[in-house]
Amino acid sequence: MKHHSLIFLTGFSGSGKSTIGPLLANSLGYDFIDLDQAIEAITGKSVSRIFAEEGESYFRKLELDTLKTVTNREELIVSLGGGALESNECYTLIKEKGTLVYLKSGSGTLTKRLCHKTDRPLLKSEQGGKLSNGEIEQKIRELLARREPRYNSATITVQTDTGRIGSTVEELTRKINRYVRKTTGNSRAK
């Protein structure tokens, strides 16, 4: 059964999911879970370390298992990892159980936000070293091209590379409440 009060935030790494998610949850009176942080708490390892030691496929299995534990909750905002929708099982579960919201940013904005980050495993060279800004932007474009069809299947999309965080949260709150009103007849997402 689909829960209108189970909201999944998707978007590329650096799009604002972990920053906007808790603020949106507060605005709606919901709880918040960052799926990557939940995986880190369960395993005692950072996402980067899991990728380095166990590989991406192992991480994606952990991601699916962790996702399954939250899909029966309501009044919850879940920040997904940037690649979570690449798993058919994760994608199907998310679309069946809740409302998908895409936080969209362009590759230039994402490059500016991510070029100084060292904890993003998919933005490292094959040998694990740091990429140049040009290489980072190229990798972001490649990953966006692969992921955007699923990102674009979201019920609600908000641009996050323009404007301020507060106005983005207000826009999301309005759009979510409008969607809930339209689909359930309730006046708010509560």
Curated annotation (Swiss-Prot):
Signal peptide: none annotated. Its main location: cytoplasm. It is found in: Cytoplasm. It comes from Chlorobium phaeobacteroides (strain DSM 266 / SMG 266 / 2430). ATP binds at residues 14-19, 120. CDD domains: SK. GO terms for cellular component: cytosol. Catalyzes the specific phosphorylation of the 3-hydroxyl group of shikimic acid using ATP as a cosubstrate. Mg(2+) binds at residue 18. This is Shikimate kinase. PROSITE patterns: SHIKIMATE_KINASE. Its EC number is 2.7.1.71. The gene is aroK. Substrate binds at residues 36, 60, 82, 147.
